[in-house]
A protein has these predicted regions:
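Gly/Ala-rich beta-loop-alpha elbow adjacent to hydrolase catalytic centers
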Residues: 145-153
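Conserved alpha/beta-hydrolase
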Residues: 89, 96-118
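An N-terminal hydrophobic leader/cap segment in hydrolases
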Residues: 2-59
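Short beta-strand/loop motif that positions the catalytic acidic residue
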Residues: 221-223, 228-230, 234
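Catalytic histidine-centered segment of alpha/beta-hydrolase-like enzymes
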Residues: 260-269
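Hydrolase active-site cap/lid region
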Residues: 162-208
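Conserved alpha/beta-hydrolase "acid-adjacent" motif
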Residues: 235-241
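Alpha/beta-hydrolase active-site loop
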Residues: 121-141
Length: 279
């Protein structure tokens, strides 16, 4: 019943966008983009509060949006953690334990519209810009990004090459924004006029076309050591996204897991990440 209601709601959005496009394609693109970039969850829940409250850092203003940071001080190199869509810094708790055992200095933050951070929406470009400013502030040696966090990390490194960063880890990261948009179109069932209007909206506001956001494209110019981890049965982001990324990332290694899902927070994964950063 719940799936049926969700499907019905999704189709109603598509019908709404299609009807809007009959009168204004520009408005249809704007509304489709707003829906695509509005998270339904990812805020701090009571189960998250006790853990995160202890490690609250300062709130950083990025593009007029306050971003909540968290800090786990250590004597070693600094690691920046970037969570995925509809998540928050709590998702890193198991990895943080392993990083602390090796004395890494750990920084995380909640993306716009997520966790304790301000805002209501998030897209790859604004997330990458958030990463850039956090990198300038904390000067991490290593960055770990899960899902959308991995995509934003690579986008930022491509757009703003930073030689102080030595290693990058991506977990279940998507390859192409165009593929995410195609999935969105298939789910909601809006027509190609709306899709074209959405692409125009992205270009007008962020100076990018949808097809420009591509991790295989970004990887060609990234010199940092990379560790790419992806589960072959991932139902959120297909494994071949990381295969294509690895193919174009000269200095990367690809770990294929089986049956660990999209979240990839199991101990065996965390140990492989920590070993990679420590080597």
């Amino acid at each position: 019943m719940r799936k049926l209601l969700y499907r019905t709601l999704a189709l109603s959005y598509g019908a709404y966008f299609n009807s809007t496009a009959l009168f204004s394609e520009k408005e249809a693109g704007k509304r489709a983009f707003k829906t695509f970039t509005t998270p339904r969850k990812g805020r701090i829940l009571p189960v998250h509060q006790e853990y995160l409250q202890e490690y609250l850092g300062k709130k950083i203003l990025v593009n007029n949006t306050g971003l909540q940071t968290y800090e786990w001080p250590g004597t070693g190199e600094t690691v920046l953690l970037m969570h995925g869509w509809e998540s928050n810094a709590f998702r890193w708790r198991y990895l943080i334990e392993k990083l602390q055992e090796r004395e890494f200095n750990i920084v995380a933050f909640d993306a716009p519209g997520h966790g304790y951070s301000e805002g209501n929406r998030l897209n790859v470009v604004t997330y990458a810009d958030s990463a850039r400013q956090l990198i300038d502030l904390y000067r991490p040696k290593h960055i770990i990004g899960h899902s959308m966090g991995g995509l934003a990390t690579l986008h930022n490194q491509y757009q703003n090459p930073n030689t102080s960063i030595e290693k990058i880890v991506t977990l279940g990261a998507p390859a192409e924004l165009s593929e995410l948009m195609a999935h969105y179109q298939n789910l909601v069932r809006f027509n190609n006029k709306v899709l074209e209007a959405l692409d125009k909206h992205v270009y007008e506001h962020f100076n990018y076309r949808v097809h420009d956001i591509s991790t295989p494209k970004f990887a060609k110019s990234i010199a940092q050591q990379g560790l790419i981890i992806h589960d072959e049965w991932d139902t959120i982001t297909p494994f071949n996204a990381s295969e294509r990324l690895h193919q174009n990332w000269k200095n990367s290694s690809l770990i294929k897991t089986t049956g660990l899902g999209h979240s990839l927070h199991q101990e065996e994964i965390n140990l492989q990440i920590v070993d990679f950063l420590s080597s």
